[in-house]
Amino acid sequence: MSDLSDIRREYTKGGLRRKDLPDNPMALFETWMTQAKEANLSDPTAMCVATVDENGQPFQRIVLLKRFDDTGFVFFTNLESRKAKQIAINKQISLLFPWHPLERQVAVLGEAEPLSMMEVAKYFISRPKDSQIAAWVSKQSSKITARQALEGKFNEMKAKFAQGEVPIPKFWGGFLVRPKSIEFWQGGEHRLHDRFIYTKAASEWQIDRLAP
């Protein structure tokens, strides 16, 4: 067994104060996302998405956030993937944005709902053609014999769709995560981190400080 207990560091990049928080958590999220992009973080839109199966077994994976607004957070995926199948069983979902270099993280609890075909189509046609073709290739989360099988299927589909537009697969779509709570975490000195949680209450958000 490896002992990692001596790996530690101080958090020194600043605090988070109640008086500085906007009433709407999405406004703070937009500020933090902008700062993450300006800091040239690797994949600032990458989020850990957690879902659960029919037995309550959770599973997590990294997915890219594609849009956010006051209604929530949007991502796209293969509808035959493990995440989509689990969402169909249980729409409760958790998102985590781990912005380690900024000593920040944002944790979201909410419910996922399918996007309309219009919203899916709008995003799909904006993707590079190779990415559109790749959506046809992978039966996500299924077992395959070798990578060559994927590459062969990609080349086959690339030839098939060489001319004209790539149609949207029926098994490809997206989800809107409507947040019920959003927690903002900022690292602090001596492990006295700042944590604030926004909880949806009717049409407003309640803001509470949490112990680190």
Curated annotation (Swiss-Prot):
PROSITE patterns: PYRIDOX_OXIDASE. SUPFAM superfamilies: FMN-binding split barrel. Transmembrane segments: none annotated. Pathway: Cofactor metabolism; pyridoxal 5'-phosphate salvage; pyridoxal 5'-phosphate from pyridoxamine 5'-phosphate: step 1/1; Cofactor metabolism; pyridoxal 5'-phosphate salvage; pyridoxal 5'-phosphate from pyridoxine 5'-phosphate: step 1/1. It holds the Pfam family PNP_phzG_C. The keyword Signal does not apply. Substrate binds at R8, R9, E10, Y11, K66, Y123, R127, S131, R191, L192, H193. Keywords: Flavoprotein, FMN, Oxidoreductase, Pyridoxine biosynthesis. It comes from the Bacteria. FMN binds at residues 61-66, 76-77, 82-83, 105, 140-141, 185, 195. InterPro entries: Pyridox_Oxase, Pyridox_Oxase_CS, Pyridox_Oxase_N, Pyridoxamine_oxidase_dimer_C, Split_barrel_FMN-bd. Binds 1 FMN per subunit. This is Pyridoxine/pyridoxamine 5'-phosphate oxidase. It comes from Shewanella denitrificans (strain OS217 / ATCC BAA-1090 / DSM 15013). The lineage of its organism: Bacteria, Pseudomonadati, Pseudomonadota, Gammaproteobacteria, Alteromonadales.
